[in-house]
Amino acid sequence: MSRAKATILCIEDHWNGLLARKMFLEKHGYEVLEASGIDEGLKLFLSRNVDAVVLDYQLPGMNGDVVAEKMKRLNSHVPIMLLSAYGPLPGRKLRSVDWFLTKSQPPTDLLSALQDLLDDQHKPFFARWLNQWKNRSQVSS
């Protein structure tokens, strides 16, 4: 999928992080919808045509893995990337997400992971699963 046509929903409760991520992704050709909380994020997810979600792990009221689980029940075809300021998360926290990055990783990692997620949407299930497995095994190393 072309970046210029991809709409990314970013959910982050820290305004500075949300604004920085939005500006960075827009600079690289993405359309970005931003939400500073869970309710706002879920409303945008349901009402807009979203190609991928970039979701903070630690949100007030509910962790990102639980939000991702709700989103997957609503639309399992939208890839979700979970970001965390904390190191690797246990595998059970990653069940409903398609990619995991720590916030300390360089922004270029976000770009390449996002493009991989968008490209993987059209791949057969096994190819998507293999990419996810490779990514998760690198995170836990």
Describe the predicted segments one by one:
Residues 12:
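Conserved acidic carboxylate
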Residues 15-33:
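Two-component/phosphorelay signaling modules centered on CheY-like receiver
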Residues 34-52:
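Acidic, metal-coordinating helix/loop segments flanking the phosphotransfer/catalytic sites
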Residues 37, 63-66:
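Acidic catalytic/metal-coordinating carboxylates
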Residues 56:
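Active-site residues of response regulator receiver
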Residues 60:
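The feature encodes the CheY-like receiver
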Residues 121-141:
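CheY-like receiver
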